[in-house]
């Protein structure tokens, strides 16, 4: 019986470690965050949205999308800001990574700002990344229903935006059904081992 107890304890420890292992494939809560549809579908566009579009390949100072992606957004409203926003459902109290890639050339006047639930997390005036893609990352807390948005203006030319994402911080993932299946299979297999041991 002592052998049976030890085997049960060991198997449960292994199975539970599998069940509660962090999910390394974080899901993006945004729709069309990489502008992969070639449009702004999934996004809400508002205010001055003149000269703002989704493009592919080389465009003005930019050689293409971030990381080789096909499409990216170019932002060029004149005189006043345009706004690009999206709402999503998440888990209240959980931590989320809000990230995006941005490129600009220091046009004057120009401005770019990013918001989480209406609170600015980034505000830039005449930003200049040398037309190179630069990643910005922020950690925020979910409320159950949240939103992100960008305000932007570039009178002379364009700024660029790509690969926008909101993902849950790893280590908080609720066990998936497949993990519960692994647990059940492990326990059932243990039962067979114990029975064979006890017959000897």
Regions found by a protein language model. Name each.
Residues 20-26:
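Sec/Tat signal peptide C-region and signal peptidase I cleavage site
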Residues 35, 82-107, 138, 148, ...:
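Extra-cytoplasmic beta-strand recognition segments
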Residues 36-72:
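Extracellular glycan-recognition surfaces and repeat-rich motifs
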Residues 71-83, 126-129:
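Extracellular beta-rich ligand/substrate-recognition surface
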Residues 107-116:
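Beta-strand acidic-aromatic groove motif in beta-rich domains, primarily in extracellular
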Residues 118-145:
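Extracellular carbohydrate recognition and processing domains
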Residues 150-157:
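Short beta-strand-plus-loop segments that form exposed binding edges in beta-rich domains
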Residues 175-195:
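A short, hydrophobic C-terminal helix/tail in secreted or cell-surface proteins
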